[in-house]
Amino acid sequence: MAEQPLADDPSAHRRRLGDDLRRSREALGLTQQQAADQLEWSLSKLIRIENGAHGVSVSDLRSMIGAYRISGQRQVDALMTAARASRAKAWWSPYRDVVPTPFARYLGYEASAVRFRIFHPFLVPGLLQTGEYAAELLKTLPDARRAQLLLELKRERQQRVFAQPGPSFVFVMGEEGLYRWIGGREVMQRQLAYLAEVARRPNTQLRIVPFEAGAYPGMAGPLVLLKLAENGEEVAFLESVGGDELIRDEPATITKYADNFETMVGKSLSRERSETLIRERVEQLGRPEAQGTDSRGAR
């Protein structure tokens, strides 16, 4: 299947625009400091624009077009269009009060990803959580309003990610996620039935790391790896009690996490065995005696 990005997002426009402007600067042989001096800007402002961390006003873009001697009308028009799009509000703007900065930045990358590789050691990954399963998890938060907004954010995020057929997905989860009771038997049964449905999608792999796999690299916490449409670059997103972390422009670090992910895939059951295990667990949860039963041997 050809890899296609998701629908455009302001942060994706910022990154593309930053890359285009950086290439134009480099074509003239200008360093970032030389360009900043010529534009009478701070170096940090130029760096933020080139990194896609900051939108570009039309007036600033005109200054850069002049400084970089960009004369082709088609290129100028494309840059202007991208600059306007880069300053639009992101879809998650209504949730900014409850979204930590690293996750907000991650959402911008997610919107232009062509491949998702996602791992969770003991829960169903967020993109695959049903509404009632997610709601049960969010009940642990002391602020009910925050919990409701996060639930709405998750629902909209899922809809956006799965709205396009282009991206490919590899989900890996620890077998514990099939047995940890979130919301009770019926909630878990519906959640796992949904996982079994997802497992059959042609663009999706869902793999279970069995208990018997023992210890493995990366098992300490959730991990997301995204391959971006713009340039094939990968970014990593990590969740932890100490705070979330988004990693970009650190190839060696991202390679380490990618290697860990592939190790987890290697220790997981095949797609077919994973789906079978999930369906067996769904059937088990449908039996009255399932309440509180550990049936890890039902494979």
Predicted stretch roles:
Residues 2-15, 19, 23, 33-37, ...:
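Interdomain hinge/linker segments and adjacent boundary elements that couple functional modules
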Residues 45-50, 242-246:
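A ubiquitous short alpha-helical element
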Residues 28-47:
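Short alpha-helical DNA-recognition segment
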Residues 184-299:
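C-terminal regulatory/effector modules of DNA-binding transcriptional regulators
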